[in-house]
A protein has these predicted regions:
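The feature marks the mature, well-folded catalytic cores of soluble enzymes
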Residues: 1-282
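Single-stranded RNA-binding regions, centering on S1/OB-family and related RNA-binding modules
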Residues: 281-324
Length: 324
């Protein structure tokens, strides 16, 4: 068995930055809360809760005298303004690539254009992006976009600005662009899929195509982790989505010759290392068992011959002192 770990597995820039801001806040001794989970990984959220940085759900829940840390997915303009109205210290951990999308949709509406957002409507990042628009339109896939455009041909001539959730797949984004290009007369695109996400997905697909089994490590609430599992499933017969090493299906994994490991953008390094370590231990066990099995077979194939014994075989050579 061989185990290969994707080079891109683990924290992306935005997640690393957000986690770093919380860690800095803790080091400075500030009282703080996060507005929603700082990232989509419950292990990280629990870690910070143990350090005194708990999660809240709304601006009204922020205790007096506490700083509020905005999650990496961002928040809507209304939420941001509600925090400012209370005079709270705001530590903005929004991913810079997500903040860029907020600016794009604001400028689009200021110029009389209609933002089209491609992404999962209920995902926190998409909810936040939509919250920076007066009249947001969100489409989860090309089918929904196609139906909306077909329902009223007059929509074809509206000025549209299209953006994507940063963790969307390139396939989804390309298919939506293709649909819009066919009928829309005033259309502009901003390729807002995070490059780290794009590279991670491409690497996962390439690795999955070379493996008998793929392990995708991450929180099940993580959108990019779920998409990685979906991408891997298109290239590999067995895909295991696990939260941590304790969820590994070891009996099935022992049957695989080559195993690949990748992880979502919000998966901590220590969890990836734990999974890799567990698989490496299995690999050592498998190799030892294979060696023992070979020795047993070799022993079974060696038989001591005595004078007078009869054997069945093929003679390949005859010498003065031996027969082969």
């Amino acid at each position: 068995m061989s185990v290969r770990v994707a080079a891109s597995a683990g924290f992306c820039f935005g997640v690393d930055r957000a986690v770093g801001l919380v860690e800095q806040t803790v080091r400075e001794g500030k009282r703080a809360v996060t507005l929603g989970p700082i990232i989509h990984n419950h292990h990280v959220v629990q870690h910070f809760a143990a350090l005194g940085v708990r999660e809240i759900a709304s601006p009204e829940e922020v205790p007096g005298g506490s700083a509020v840390i905005i999650r990496s997915h961002g928040v809507s303009r209304a939420v941001y303004e509600a925090l400012q109205a209370r005079g709270l210290e705001i530590i903005d951990a929004t991913c810079p690539f997500v903040s860029r999308i907020h600016r794009i949709v604001q400028e689009a509406e200021a110029n009389g254009r209609q933002p089209l957002i491609i992404g999962t409507p209920e995902h926190p990042e998409v909810v936040a992006i939509a919250g920076w628009c007066r009249h947001p339109l969100v489409f989860p896939d090309g089918e929904a976009l196609q139906k909306w455009l077909d329902d009223d041909p007059k929509r074809h001539d509206l000025p549209f600005t299209m953006v994507s959730q940063t963790t969307s797949t390139q396939f989804l984004w390309d298919s939506c662009k293709k649909i819009a290009k066919k009928v829309c007369t005033s259309l502009e695109f901003f390729d807002t899929i995070c490059k780290a996400t794009e590279n991670r997905q491409a690497e996962a697909a390439a690795l999955a195509a070379q493996c008998d089994a793929m392990i995708v490590v991450g929180d099940r609430k993580s959108s990019n982790t779920g998409r990685l599992a979906h991408i891997c499933a298109a290239h590999c017969p067995q895909v295991f989505l696990v939260d941590n090493a304790s969820e590994l299906d070891l009996p099935k994994l022992r049957q695989a010759g080559t195993i690949g490991i990748t992880a979502g953008a919000s998966t901590p390094a220590w969890i990836i290392k734990e999974v890799n370590h567990t698989m490496s231990e299995i690999n050592t066990t498998v190799d030892a068992a294979a060696e023992e099995s070979f020795e047993e077979l070799l022993g079974q194939g060696i038989k001591t011959l005595n004078t007078g014994d009869k054997v069945l075989g093929t003679v390949t050579a005859i010498g003065n002192t031996e027969i082969q």
